Amino acid sequence: MLYKGDTLYLDWLEDGIAELVFDAPGSVNKLDTATVASLGEAIGVLEQQSDLKGLLLRSNKAAFIVGADITEFLSLFLVPEEQLSQWLHFANSVFNRLEDLPVPTIAAVNGYALGGGCECVLATDYRLATPDLRIGLPETKLGIMPGFGGSVRMPRMLGADSALEIIAAGKDVGADQALKIGLVDGVVKAEKLVEGAMAILRQAINGDLDWKAKRQPKLEPLKLSKIEATMSFTIAKGMVAQTAGKHYPAPITAVKTIEAAARFGREEALNLENKSFVPLAHTNEARALVGIFLNDQYVKGKAKKLTKDVETPKQAAVLGAGIMGGGIAYQSAWKGVPVVMKDINDKSLTLGMTEAAKLLNKQLERGKIDGLKLAGVISTIHPTLDYAGFDRVDIVVEAVVENPKVKKAVLAETEQKVRPDTVLASNTSTIPISELANALERPENFCGMHFFNPVHRMPLVEIIRGEKSSDETIAKVVAWASKMGKTPIVVNDCPGFFVNRVLFPYFAGFSQLLRDGADFRKIDKVMEKQFGWPMGPAYLLDVVGIDTAHHAQAVMAAGFPQRMQKDYRDAIDALFDANRFGQKNGLGFWRYKEDSKGKPKKEEDAVVDDLLAEVSQPKRDFSEEEIIARMMIPMVNEVVRCLEEGIIATPAEADMALVYGLGFPPFHGGAFRWLDTLGSAKYLDMAQQYQHLGPLYEVPEGLRNKARHNEPYYPPVEPARPVGDLKTA
């Protein structure tokens, strides 16, 4: 054994050839600060070996290196800029020394090689991969950019266009694509990986492969003519501006850095990467996006722990076809759980099957599946007008009309047709689960399962625990949601549960602004362009459906009369009374026409101004700051109340529900991350200016306490140790 660290070791393989093996405790390898330091020590040992002829890098895990240790990021990002820069220089010196070894090097890459894992193998001369490879640089999705030389080496290896596509979008690619663009040199079966890598290494040692020529381009300026460079970088900057926008500085910073570094050799180019990385790491956007990643891991870990003792349902059923039922049936079947889809009429069943077939055809068109797979999936969805096969199902989700009487009747009837251990769930969006449970003989086997539309796209499923829902019932429903590829978050019961309960105060803020003379077009523009929502409130209401919102608004007002009962006729009432139901009938706040692809495109409609004039004061202008404050305060206050009342268990789960269920702007990180970034005292000062607008603007006492004591909602993070300690971690 030449060297043994906590996460990697170095040993001789055969005469003159050494192997460096990543083998961290636990299931995966991460390129954390300790591993970077250990890698430097191992390379130091190699540099002393006069008889070294070649080096093989490999992993003892199912994946090569999954990336940097993101749990370290928040503390690293608190280190002063100068110290963070010093540490990056140290880390890059390690990869430079790997790249500069006076012998050929090869990485045998299996599974994931992401972020720092990808940057590590870019420093070797050759890369051989297994078919399950996923390799790439996802850093821009975390609000940063590659920091271990990825933005320097990848463009010089692949050319600017392919590298920019991966780096700016934070993409990873599979084995075939990696081979096509030159990111790996070959792909072999897993059992042949080391043997194949050794064969390449021996060819390089014997002079049959010119490893020095392979290495040289990574040390030099990027080989691009002035015209090629102008075209590549202009197109890349245009694409980034269009897709990422101003709220995500990392992608455009990465592109500009690669452009600026193109005319320099490795050392100067790495210095530019360092100078760009450090300021990004100190942005609120990076903290928010890293926070989302960590919250996502927490939520998924919680679901995994919850379901460890239950079996995933093997057969499911959906009550109520149509678009929603068809979407749920498709998602279940697509992920391998056969489903019976029941409705009371053929027309709805046809609509549900058409929806499932349409979604499968999209997968076929994209080349994700072939005709055989399509037929196989669709054959596991069984449409029926009766209860045939219900005695075999493990779980049933009801997705009929949002009416408590209808839902109770359907659930009670279904309970008599299934096994005593079958779980029943309701896809209600607002009706309290404990109220629906009153109709059942086995309420312990019942809970809520709130999907979001469109089901195949929206990652969140709210799992609602009723007063009598058993732990086993919740666990089984969470297991099914996870199997469907969704992110389940368990919440406690109340009208609207969590997501809709906090959404309707946001809509109430919108209605009050319109009542006071604001223009809905400006509100949409401000909330989209300035705050960052994917849709402004008027557009969102049109997508949800004005009729749906009108009904849900009444349910929420009955559930929370002190805050959500209104004493005036609002814009939603006016549009509902005029039969303007939004996208579903082409008329809402906006008018909708289908574009060439059959998608609804919004247009202005002067008629709506006359309708709104009946429920509004004369038009007046509002500042962007006032619009944002009046829209967000009611939502944030309600989010805080939900945490204080135990409707949602943690700030992390609340923020993920908002991001995954409502599209809360990820660069803000969710309501609690936004509050912590803004500061609770500053938020309180802002909210107090609008208390005269009513109970929705009254800040909860718990938040007032946070402001008094200057306490955040997320646990405070300590800065990482000084850079000198990091080096020898």
Swiss-Prot record:
Ranges where the record places region Enoyl-CoA hydratase/isomerase: 1-189
Could you name the domain of life of the organism this protein comes from?
Bacteria
Q: Where does NAD(+) bind?
A: 324, 343, 400-402, 407, 429, 453
What EC number(s) does the entry state?
Answer: 4.2.1.17, 5.1.2.3, 5.3.3.8, 1.1.1.35
Q: Where does substrate bind?
A: 296, 500, 660
| Catalyzed chemical reaction(s) | a (3S)-3-hydroxyacyl-CoA + NAD(+) = a 3-oxoacyl-CoA + NADH + H(+); a (3S)-3-hydroxyacyl-CoA = a (2E)-enoyl-CoA + H2O; a 4-saturated-(3S)-3-hydroxyacyl-CoA = a (3E)-enoyl-CoA + H2O; (3S)-3-hydroxybutanoyl-CoA = (3R)-3-hydroxybutanoyl-CoA
Name assigned to this protein: Fatty acid oxidation complex subunit alpha
Q: Which species is this record about?
A: Escherichia coli O7:K1 (strain IAI39 / ExPEC)
